[in-house]
Amino acid sequence: MSIKNDKWIRRMAEQHKMIEPFAPHLVSRCDERSIISYGTSSYGYDVRCADEFKIFTNINSAIVDPKQFDSKSFVDVQSDVCIIPPNSFALARTIEYFRIPRDVLTICLGKSTYARCGIIVNVTPLEPEWEGHVTLEFSNTTPLPAKIYAHEGVAQLLFLQADDVCETSYKDRKGKYQGQTGVTLPRA
């Protein structure tokens, strides 16, 4: 299994629509101001966060149960920024829509800019032949409110190509998050 470089990422995005919309180079400025970078890097792709957020709240004193998740545990926010309460979390989604090839596994890592502020991003691997918007989870590990910026880089995806094609892909087994759009809550 090998990690794929910028040339491969560009080719797959342009010829196979692996990433849409796609930035072929790293973008770190917009309208003459610095932003948290997004786009193609040496061995990965830095994704952007859309302006749709679900901020966790405990106003209903609900129990968090992944098998019976109560959507009332979130407050929906549409904004260029998301303020995550102390020791809480928020869900968001990527601007980019992904179509992962059958012989590729994609791993997501947080960006150091956010990690150095105590904001951790978590995404499970994007499996072979999965497609959709990536649902992002941001944990604020600090005792202070934390800010996430929409339309800027929030995480990096690494593409690992297998030596052999898998026998059963995510699409083959009809994975429950296949083709997801928007911020997707847990499904049991």
From Swiss-Prot:
Keyword Metal-binding attributed: no
Pathway: Pyrimidine metabolism; dUMP biosynthesis; dUMP from dCTP (dUTP route): step 1/2
A Gene Ontology biological process term: dUMP biosynthetic process
Listed InterPro entries: dCTP_deaminase (IPR011962), dUTPase-like_sf (IPR036157), dUTPase_trimeric (IPR033704)
Enzymatic reactions: dCTP + H2O + H(+) = dUTP + NH4(+)
Entry keyword set: Hydrolase, Nucleotide metabolism, Nucleotide-binding
Pfam families named in the record: DCD (PF22769)
Active site: E137 (proton donor/acceptor)
Residue positions binding dCTP: K111, S112, T113, Y114, A115, R116, T135, L136, E137, Q156, Y170, Q180
Record-linked SUPFAM superfamilies: dUTPase-like (SSF51283)
EC id: 3.5.4.13
Entry annotated with the keyword Cytoplasm: no
Coiled coil residues, start to end: none
Subunit structure and binding partners: Homotrimer.
Job description of the protein: Catalyzes the deamination of dCTP to dUTP.
PANTHER family membership: DCTP DEAMINASE
Family to which this protein belongs: Belongs to the dCTP deaminase family.
Protein name: dCTP deaminase
